[in-house]
Amino acid sequence: DRALALNANDVRGLFWKAVAMGKIAEDSGMLNALRLIRSMEELLLKVVMLDETYENAGAHRALGRIYHLLPGFPISFGSNQKALIHLQRAYELFPKDVITRAFYADLLYDQGQKKEARHHADFVMSAPIHQEDELEYAEYVKIARNVASKTNDRTVKLGNFIRFQE
């Protein structure tokens, strides 16, 4: 908050405040989470406006995930249409981003686009991940494996968690 008090348009401060709010929302009850998420949405929309490429289009990616997972009206403001707009844009900007591709696969599957969802899930599952990044990316690989397991093609590529020798 102090950094943003000095510069209300600091993309880094806006983005990471939104991320922190998201983590708090995950750990709080449903009502508190819904209150935090609206403020988080505002911060992320501002990041998109100021620099949509920051953190590999992290604001687009986060907004896409929020809109996809939240219930729609009248309970909340979830919207698969908005989710698709943001995740498509994140994918256009950073097509090799594992997190974006995992979230995109999940959304596409839920929208009935199973073949396209599987394509993105396969990308995530075959992406080389350094040993030191395994824990960070495990959640996204799990999302991709879940999408893959729900598609008709029962073959699951297991190219992840390659240990690089340096």
What positions do the PLM features span?
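Conserved structural position within tetratricopeptide repeats
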Residues: 4-5, 48-49, 85-92, 126
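TPR alpha-solenoid repeat register
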Residues: 13, 56-59, 100, 134
